[in-house]
Each structure stands twice: as C-alpha cells, then as structure tokens.
C-alpha cells in the first residue's frame, strides 16, 4: 500500500517551530495549492486548497528560514488525527507529514507592509 503526496504551493505564513520536551524540533506551516477548471458556461474558475504541513527534526530547523509567500515543493504522507478542542468538541485534522521540502522560489523579507 502507498501513502504518498506531492504538493507544490505557496507558504500561507512563516513556519512555526517548537521543541518538544524530549528535545525534538517540530514545525508546522500552511501551504496553498491552486487548481483551475472551466465551469459549465466555459469560464475559467480557480480554487485554492489549504494544507497543514508538519516537519520534524532537521527538516523543521531548515524550514524555519522560509517565509510567507515562498513557492515550495513538499513530499510526504497524509496523516489523520483527532483531538478535543477547548469546548470539548472532537475535531478531525488531516496533516501532510513531510519528509522532503524544497524551496522553489526565493522571496526576501520586505520592510514594506502590504
């Protein structure tokens, strides 16, 4: 059986990295992918999907340097998990657990807002 996903998209925000109690770094970032299709009237429509990406260890440390808006290649596996939120409601979450992340487009931090 195969559980493999490949995505190319734009970072929705700067990656957030933290260190677990055992010293293992773990990072998270959102990734936007887009798709275009023709509707029944023949007009092009764009859709955007948002993906939660999780990175571990050295990969988490490398991804800390990435910034919002950069184009990246992600390869990994789909992982589904459940958790209970602060209101006691059980939630289902789908993550992409990445084993490869490559920067495809370098974009520098800007001092201008917007």
Residue ranges of model-derived segments:
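Acidic, gly/ser/pro-rich intrinsically disordered tails
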Residues: 1-3, 15-24, 38-44, 61-64, ...
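OB-fold and OB-like beta-barrel modules that bind single-stranded nucleic acids
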Residues: 6-13, 31, 68-80, 98-101
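Beta-rich strand-turn-strand
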Residues: 53-91
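Residue-level recognition of the GNAT/N-acetyltransferase active site
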Residues: 12, 56, 104
């Amino acid at each position: 059986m195969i559980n493999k996903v490949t995505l190319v998209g734009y970072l929705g925000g700067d990656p957030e990295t933290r260190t677990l109690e055992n010293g293992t770094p773990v990072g998270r970032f959102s990734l936007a992918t887009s798709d275009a299709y023709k509707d029944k009237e023949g007009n092009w429509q764009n859709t955007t999907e948002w993906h939660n990406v999780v990175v571990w260890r050295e990969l988490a440390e490398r991804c800390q340097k990435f910034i919002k808006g950069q184009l990246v290649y992600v390869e990994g596996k789909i992982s589904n998990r459940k958790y209970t939120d602060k209101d006691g409601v059980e939630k289902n979450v789908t993550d992409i657990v990445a084993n490869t992340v490559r920067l495809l487009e370098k974009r520098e931090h800007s001092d201008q807002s917007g």
